[in-house]
Amino acid sequence: MAESAKLLFYNKVIDGTAIKQFIGRLVAHFGITYTAHILDQLKTLGFQQATYAATSLGIDDLLTAPSKGWLIQDAEHHSYTLEKHHRYGNVHAVEKLRQLIETWYATSEYLKQEMNPNFRMTDPLNPVHMMSFSGARGSASQVHQLVGMRGLVSDPQGQIIDLPIKSNFREGLSLTEYIISCYGARKGVVDTAVRTSDAGYLTRRLVEVVQHIVVRKTDCNTFRGISLNSTEDKKKNLQIFTQQKLVGRVLADNLYINARCLAIRNQDINTNLIEKLITLKTPLISIRSPLTCKSMLWICQLCYGWSLTHYGDLVELGEAVGIIAGQSIGEPGTQLTLRTFHTGGVFTGDIAEHVRTPFNGTIEFDTDLVYPTRTRHGHPAWVCRTDLAVTIKSQNKIHNLIIPSQSLLLIQNNQYVESKQLIAEVHAKVSPFKEKVQKYIYCNIEGEMHWSKRVRHASKYLHSNVHLIFNTGHLWILSGSSHEDKTSSMFFKNQDQINTKFFISPRKILFMKKTNQVNSKNLDPYLEKEMETLNYSNLYLGILNKSRNFVYPSIILHDYEVKRIYDEKKGENFLLLEERHGEKKTQIFRRFVLNIPKSGILENKDIFAISNDPGYGIQSPGIIKYGTIKVNPIKGKGETFKNRETKILRLRPRYQVIEPGNFFPIPEEVHILYESFPPILVRNDSLIKKNTQITSDIRSQVGGLVRIRRKMNDSYEVKVLPGRVYHPEERRNISKQNDILVPPGEEISNKFQSENWLYLEWITPPKEKPFIFIRPAIEFIVPEETDLAETFTLNSQKKQEILKVKKIRYLLYEDGEEVEVTNKTGIQLIQTGLVLDWKEDSSIKKVYASLTEIETNGLSKKFLQISLIEHPIFEIEKKKNNVNLKYLFTNEINYSSHSFNYENGLFNGYRGIIRISSNENQEDKSLPILSPFDFVQIFLSKNSEEYTPEMKDEGNFNLDTNSIFYAKSFVKKFNQNSITSSQNSSGTFINKEFYNHNNINQEFNSRKIIRNFFLSIERNFMEILLLRKLGLLGNSHSLPSPFQFSCWANTHNQPIINRYSILENLRDVFQVPKWYFFDENKKTHKLDLSKNSIYHLLTWSFSIALSYEEGAIHLVGLGQFICENISISSKYQTISESGQIIAIHPEFLVVRLAKPSLATGGATIHSHYGQIIKKGDVLITLVYERLKSGDIIQGLPKVEQLLEARPINSTSINLENGFENWNRDMTKSLGSLWGFLLSAKTTMNQSQINLVDQIQEVYQSQGVYISDKHIEIVVRQMTSKVLTLEDGMANGFLPGELIESSRAQRMNRVLEESVLYKPILLGITKASLNTQSFISEASFQETTRVLAKAALRGRIDWLKGLKENVIFGGVISAGTGCQEVVWQVILEKRKETYSKRKKNKLFSGRVRDVFSYYQRILFFPTMKIIHKTLKKPLSEINLDPNYRK
C-alpha cells in the first residue's frame, strides 16, 4: 500500500478520457486486484446516487428547441431558391448539391448548438440533458437526433443523399425519411443486413490467417525494429501520439539524448519514460514490433510488448495473441459505418479564413490584377493574380488591407459594402490533396440539343460524339417528342402541320402485280432491318410518271454481291463486295471492303470500296522508287494513318496508276529507340555485319550501312541499309550515277554487272572518302488490266451521263516516300477501289449508298445501290403525300390494284408541327432555314420607297448572352418588274422545295405595322385557335422592326389559298413570309433532311399575348432563347417558362419550351449539335475537384480492400512523407555492394508500416481505436512469404513457389547456390491458403483442391497450429497452463542460471546449441526432447535437468 501523501486527489468533473487515465494510474500504482476493488466502490456509489435522485427517462423529457421551426423554414426557402437558380441555368448540379449539403449541415449544427442552452434555460435537471452532457451515456450527436433533426444521411456507397431528414425521433419519421434513414443508420435495416455478414466473414478470414501465432519465447534476439517519428505529424497531439504508439512497447536500441543514455535496449516504455520523451522532444525512436520478430511460427514477448489486459506487464508465454488480434480487428467491422450520418459528410473546401470589412464604405482595388471565376457554389468571384491591395473608404475612415494571391474576391470594384460583410476568402497555404471526379448529368426531358459558341464543335475523339466545353456556357434542350423514321420516305416535310390522328408514315407500302414478282427489301446500312417491300416486274432506271410520285434515280451494282464477314481478331463484322465475272471455270473473283460512312452520304471522287491487290505487299520498311510507272494524285478524301513521330492521324493521299510499269521498294532495317539516352553501340555512317550488337538487347538482322537520326520526343531512329560499298577511281561522272536504278545485266562504272535490280546512292561521310552505296531493289510490275475499264453509269432521259461508278488502281506511296512497318505487319502498296465520278459543274453534290436485297426464283442476294439525293432534271410537280423511295423504275408498271397497309403504322394523336432536326453526321450542326419557296422581296406598302437596309442584329434581352441565336433578315434589292415564276408545261407553279401540303398562305395586310408591343399573360380562346392555325412555325404576319420585311411571291394573280389562311378576303396576291435561323457563328445553312423528326411540337409550346400600347420594350427575335423569370416589360409579369421563340404575331409570341443546363469549362457533352436526345440519356459530364478522402470506398469495404491487398487506382495520400522516409532510408544503401538487396528490404519494411497506418486510419476516422500490435501481426503474415524467381530444382524449389521468408534465408546459409526470391504481399485469403498446414487450408476454402494437391505432393502436417489440433481433438498448444509452455518457462529460467555460471566455470567438449547462433555448452533438454517428453504421461516425466535416457 502506498503512503497517503503520494495519493492523487481529483477535484473536478471526470469524463470518459479522465476515467481511463485514472484507471491506468491505479493499475500502475496498486495493481489489478486493488484497482478492481476501488472500481467496485465507485460502481456502488454511482448506483446509490442514481437511486436517491430517482432519475428516469420518458418521452416527455425529449424537448425540441423552439428555434427549429424557423431554422427549417429558412433552410427550405434557401433550397427552393437554389432549385430555381438550377432551373434557370445559373448553377449546375454539383454546385447545387454543394450548397444544399452545406445549408442543411449548417442548419443541423446550429440546431445542435441551440440544444444545450435550451435545456439549461428551460429544464436544467432534465434527465436527457444530465445524461448526455455529463459524459455518462450518449453523446450530443445522439441526443441531437432525438430532439433536433437527423440531418443528412449517406448511402451504402458513401455518397450523401441530398434529401435531408428534417424530423427527429421524438416527432417521428415519415415513410420517405424512414427509408433514407435505413441506409446510414447504425442499426438500420439496410446497414445491419449487409455489414453484419461482411464483418463476420472478415473476422473469420483474419482469425484464419493468424490462428497459429502464440507467444513462445521471451526474446528472439533480433536487432531490428521500426522507427517512429513523434514529430512527423504536427497536426496530432504529441501526447496522444505517444500514448497510442509507444506505451507498452519495447525499445529495439539504446536511446541517447545528447550523448546520454536515456533508456537501454529491451526496456519497456512506460508513462514515466513517455513524459521524459515529451519533455526532451525526442524525434526518432526505434521500437520492437511483431513485424521484425525473427521467430518463424510464433512471436516473442519483447517484440509484442505489454499485455493489453494486464497493464504494465509483458504478455505471458502461451497467450494466443493471433486470435486476439484477428478478433480485435474484425469485431469493430460492424461499427465502421456508425457515425457517418452524424457529421453529414459535408463537402469542405480548402478555405482557411475569411476577410470581412471593419466598417461601412466603398471598396477599391486594381481590376487588372484579378480575373473572373466561379466559386464552388456557383457565385461570381474574382481570383487575385498576385497580392492585391484593397482600400475601403468611408466618409471619415480609410482602411487598407492586402489580399494574398490566389484568393477569391466576392465583391466588385467600387462596390458599397457593409460592416462585417464577407469580401474575400483566403486559401490555405498548404492545399489538401484533391481528386478529380466526374459526375454525369442526365436529361430530364426529351428534345433537341443546342449549345453555345463556347463548345468545341469538333469531337474530342475520332468517330465520337463527345464535345469539349472551353468556358462556362449553357446547353438547351428544345422540348419535343421524337420519332425515328425507319424509312427514307416521309409523307410530310419539315414544318408541316399535322391534324389529330393523321397517318404519318406506314411501315409497308404494297404494290401488287399479277406478272413475274421480284421482291426487293430496302435494308438499313449495317443493321439490315427490313423497312419497305415493293413488288415489281423488271428492275431498271427511270422515273415513275404514272402516279406523279417523286423518286430518286439509282444505280445497282449487280456484279458485286454484298456479304457479311466476321473478323475474329478484331471481333467486328465487315461488309464485303464480292466481284464475279465470266463463266465458272474462268471466273474472276475479288473482294472489296466497304468504306461507307454511317450516314451513307458520299461525295464526288469518294472511294467507297477498297480491295488489296495480291502480290503487292511488303514485310519490311524502306523507301519507294518509281520506275516506268506513271501516276496522278487523286483529289478527294484520303486514307487516315498515324504518324509515328507525332502520333497524329493524318490523311494519306492516293496516286492513281495511269500507265502501267514498275516500281521498286528499297528495303532497310529500322529500329526506334524511345529512351532519352539509348546505349547505341554503333556509329553513324559505319559499316556493320549481320548480328552486330546495336544496343544491349538488339542485334542487326542484316549487314550494311548504319544511319542514325534523332527524332521527336527524345527518340532515335537507327537504320541499317543493306548493300555494298564501292569506291570509284574516277569521280567525274559520279553525279550521274547517284539516286538511280540499275537493271539486271547493266555495268556499273564499267567494272561489274548487276544480276538483279540495284539502287545506287552517293554517300559522303564526314572525315572519310565518299563512296557509292549499292543497295538491292525489289521490282513490282503493274500490268494492264482489262477489268478496270468496266463502269456503271446513270444516264438521264436524254442519254446524258450523270453519274459513273468506275474501278481504279492506285498506289499509297509517292516516289521517294518512306514506308513504315509497325507491329511486324505487312504493308499494302497498291489497292483497287470503286470510286464515284461526276462532272465538276454538275449540280449533284452528294449521293446516298444503301443495301438492296433482290430475290429471284427463291434465291436472295444483297447488292449495293447508289442513289441521287437531288438532281434538277428529275424534279417534277409534287402533290400531297409525295413518296420519297429509294427504288427507281423506267418502264410503266400496272398499279391497277395497289393498297396501303396501315398495320403497325404511326399516327399522330395531336395537332403539331413536323420539325426535322439537323443530321448528326453533318459538319454544320445548326437550325434549318425555314423558307419553303423561292422568294423575291417586295415592299409592304405600295407607296414606300425602295430601301435596302443592311443586315442588323435584333436586340435581345436574354441574360445568357452565350446561348443566343440571332434572328436576321437578308434583304436584297429587286425591281418589281423582274419578278418571275417558273412554270412547267401545264402552267402549274413549281415548288422547288419539297413541301407537301398545308402550305401557309398569309394574306397581305396593308394596315400600318405596329412597331411597339409588349408581352402580356392574358390568354383567350381566340389566341389559342390562332396558334393552332399558325401552320408553318416561324412565319410572322407583321413585323415589329423596320429592318425586317415580309417576303412574298407573285404567282401571276393565281393565289393558292389554304384552308388555314388567317385572312381569306384578300385574294389578289400570294404572300409567304421568310425567316432565317442563325447559328452562333451567324451563318445560314441549308435545310437538311434527317431520319429523326420531332412532332407534337405545339403540345410543348405556349403563347404569350402581345398588346400594342405605347412604351417600347426590348425587341425579341425569332429563334431567340429566353429564360424563365425574365421580364420584357417592367409593367407586366415575368415569363413563366424558358424556351425559344419560334413564331411572332402582332398579338402574341409562340415559345417552344426548353430546358437550360449550365456546364463549366472542362466538361464534355455527349451529343451532337441538333441531335435528338431522349429522357434519361447522359447529357453532360461535369468535372470537379473534391477532397481526397475515404468517401468513395469507406468503412468495411476499405479495410477489406487493404487486407486483401487489392490494387487501388489512386496513389498514397501522404506522398511527401513517404518520399522523405524513402530518401532517409535509401541513402544509406546507395553505393553499397549489396545496395539493391538492402533497398528491396527497406521498401518492403516501409510498405508494411504504410499498410498498418492506412488500416488504422480507416478505423480511427470513425472513432474505433485498435492497438497497432494487432494490425502488425496480421500484416506480418501477409508479408511473410517470398516468391522464388528462377529454376531451383537443384535447391528443391520450383520457380514461382511461395515459401517462408525465414526458411529461404536459412536455406541460403546452407546451400552453395543461393535461392533467388523477391518479397510479395498476399491478401489474407491467399495467405490462409498458403500455410504449412494443409488441414487448416482445407477447413477454410477449396477443400477438395487443397487435399488433392497435398496428397500429390505428399505433404506432412505437424499440427503446430491451434486449428489443426481442434479438428483432430488434440490439446491446443496455447495457454499459460500448457505443458509445452511450462517446459518453455523452465528452459528460459535455466538458461539464465547457466548463463550466470558460465562466467565462473569452463566446460570441455563441443556441443552444438540449437537455441543460439553462438557456440555454447549447455546441459538442458532440446526441443526434440521436449516434444518426446510431452507425449508421455505426466507421472513418468523426470524434471531433473541432468537426466538423459
From Swiss-Prot:
The keyword Electron transport does not apply. InterPro entries: DNA-dir_RpoC2_beta_pp (IPR012756), RNA_pol_beta''_euk (IPR050254), RNA_pol_Rpb1_3_sf (IPR042102), RNA_pol_Rpb1_4 (IPR007083), RNA_pol_Rpb1_5 (IPR007081), Rpb1_funnel_sf (IPR038120). It is found in: Plastid, Chloroplast. Binds 1 Zn(2+) ion per subunit. CDD domains: RNAP_beta'_C. It comes from the Eukaryota. It catalyses: RNA(n) + a ribonucleoside 5'-triphosphate = RNA(n+1) + diphosphate. One of its GO terms (biological process) is DNA-templated transcription. One of its GO terms (cellular component) is chloroplast. Pfam families: RNA_pol_Rpb1_4, RNA_pol_Rpb1_5. Belongs to the RNA polymerase beta' chain family. RpoC2 subfamily. DNA-dependent RNA polymerase catalyzes the transcription of DNA into RNA using the four ribonucleoside triphosphates as substrates. In plastids the minimal PEP RNA polymerase catalytic core is composed of four subunits: alpha, beta, beta', and beta''. When a (nuclear-encoded) sigma factor is associated with the core the holoenzyme is formed, which can initiate transcription. This is DNA-directed RNA polymerase subunit beta''. It comes from Anthoceros angustus. The lineage of its organism: Eukaryota, Viridiplantae, Streptophyta, Embryophyta, Anthocerotophyta. The gene is rpoC2.
